[in-house]
């Protein structure tokens, strides 16, 4: 098992190209309460959809790195992170990219609702940003939650992300386009 980063409670390991790991994603992403925060309640995932989205990531073909979050040895969700190019995160009008050489985008899903509102997401985001700054040499990290996801926005602000701007019609969610908030954390 390839550990990406860990502390005494949280471990994030690389997604494996195997049915056990894909089945975790089906369990999380078919739960309508979880879907409300990830692609919408109108789009619960089945096994084929999980394979379509995550198989090439698990195989290392897609550059997005996916890690399964384990809290005290229980798989509870996942993170994704990837190097970004200038302009990819709608940041050109609010960030001078000449000041930043290496940037990453990231996101997180706590799929096990028993771990919601327990600080696990905040702790995982803190560990992930430390990993990206210290091991991947990032000097800026972006995340873009939807404007209505106040819990996520608070979580990101707790670990030092700042709101930069609203992105109109950022993503399709429950069959309609929703606005997002571009947030960034610098080294």
Where does each model-flagged region fall?
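A short, well-structured alpha-helix characteristic of acyl/acetyltransferase catalytic modules
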Residues: 1-55
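Conserved acetyl-CoA-binding loop-helix of GNAT-fold acetyltransferases
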Residues: 117-131, 153-158
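Conserved beta-strand-loop-alpha-helix junction that forms the acyl-donor binding cleft
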Residues: 143-153, 170-177
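Conserved active-site tyrosine of GNAT-family acetyltransferases
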Residues: 156, 161, 183
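Glycine-rich phosphate/pyrophosphate-binding loop shared by adenosine-nucleotide-utilizing enzymes
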Residues: 10, 74-78, 178
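Conserved GNAT acetyl-CoA-binding A-motif
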Residues: 134-144
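Acetyl-CoA-dependent GNAT
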Residues: 48-115, 186-187
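Terminal substrate-recognition subdomain of acyl/acetyltransferases
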Residues: 1-2, 169, 175-187
């Amino acid at each position: 098992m390839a550990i990406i980063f860990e502390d005494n409670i949280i471990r994030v390991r690389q997604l494996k190209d195997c049915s056990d790991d894909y089945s975790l994603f089906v369990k999380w992403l078919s739960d309508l309460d979880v879907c409300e925060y990830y692609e919408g309640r109108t789009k619960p995932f089945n096994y084929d959809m999980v394979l379509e989205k995550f198989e090439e990531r698990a195989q290392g073909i897609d550059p997005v790195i996916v890690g399964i979050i384990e809290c005290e040895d229980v798989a509870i969700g996942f993170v994704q992170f990837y190097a970004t190019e200038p302009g990819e995160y709608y940041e050109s009008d609010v960030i001078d990219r000449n000041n930043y050489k290496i940037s990453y985008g990231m996101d997180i899903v706590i799929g096990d609702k028993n771990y919601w509102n327990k600080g696990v997401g905040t702790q995982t985001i803190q560990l992930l940003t430390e990993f990206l700054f210290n091991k991947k040499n990032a000097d800026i990290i972006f995340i873009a939650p939807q404007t209505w996801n106040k819990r996520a926005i608070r979580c990101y602000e707790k670990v030092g992300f700042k709101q930069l701007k609203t992105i109109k019609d950022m993503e399709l969610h429950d069959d309609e386009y929703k606005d997002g908030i571009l947030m960034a954390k610098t080294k």
